[in-house]
């Protein structure tokens, strides 16, 4: 979106704040229904970021696929799980939770140190694909494919990782 600077910054800060609150809600809320709704809020905030970054296709795909399909699937899976199982579990912190927290904190700090030091120029190899698109030799579906493989490669891969993690979580919850 082409918004004035202060409005763009306010929306980015608001989206980041709501994203953090939603992420904490996913992790800290004990009721799995509330946690699933918090996940939906996180996915909507990610879509807001894509809108603010002028990636409208990725934003709409995020809304339709992840919020509209995957999150609804997770909510249905949580609703089919027996609710009394959640209230009986009094052991809130296990060794697996500690190990998972350690791995996640390590990944976050390594990303925080790696991303600012990375030269992203070599990753965006879009010159040739942009020349093909500008010549008008391909149709719209091919343009979407080229943009997903070049301009939106990193967001597309991150979305696929989110999908994989959500499917693993849904399968784990269904087995319990």
Swiss-Prot record:
- What taxonomic classification does the UniProt entry list for its organism? Eukaryota, Viridiplantae, Streptophyta, Embryophyta, Tracheophyta
Q: Where are the transmembrane segments?
A: 10-30, 33-53, 60-80, 95-115, 152-172
**In which compartments does the protein localize?**
Plastid, Chloroplast thylakoid membrane
Family to which the UniProt record says this protein belongs: Belongs to the complex I subunit 6 family.
EC number of this enzyme = 7.1.1.-
Q: What does this protein do?
A: NDH shuttles electrons from NAD(P)H:plastoquinone, via FMN and iron-sulfur (Fe-S) centers, to quinones in the photosynthetic chain and possibly in a chloroplast respiratory chain. The immediate electron acceptor for the enzyme in this species is believed to be plastoquinone. Couples the redox reaction to proton translocation, and thus conserves the redox energy in a proton gradient.
Q: How does it sit in the membrane?
A: Multi-pass membrane protein
Subunit structure of this entry?
NDH is composed of at least 16 different subunits, 5 of which are encoded in the nucleus.
Organism annotation: Triticum aestivum (Wheat)
Q: Does the keyword RNA-binding apply?
A: no
Please give the catalytic activity noted in the UniProt record. a plastoquinone + NADH + (n+1) H(+)(in) = a plastoquinol + NAD(+) + n H(+)(out); a plastoquinone + NADPH + (n+1) H(+)(in) = a plastoquinol + NADP(+) + n H(+)(out)
Please give the GO cellular component terms listed in this UniProt entry: chloroplast thylakoid membrane
Q: What is its main location?
A: plastid
Name by which UniProt lists this protein: NAD(P)H-quinone oxidoreductase subunit 6, chloroplastic
Q: State the Gene Ontology terms under molecular function.
A: NADH dehydrogenase (ubiquinone) activity; quinone binding
- Give the domain of life: Eukaryota
Q: Gene3D superfamilies of this UniProt entry?
A: NADH-ubiquinone/plastoquinone oxidoreductase chain 6, subunit NuoJ (1.20.120.1200)
> Keywords, A to Z?
Chloroplast, Membrane, NAD, NADP, Plastid, Plastoquinone, Quinone, Thylakoid, Translocase, Transmembrane, Transmembrane helix, Transport
One of the Pfam families matching this protein, by short name: Oxidored_q3
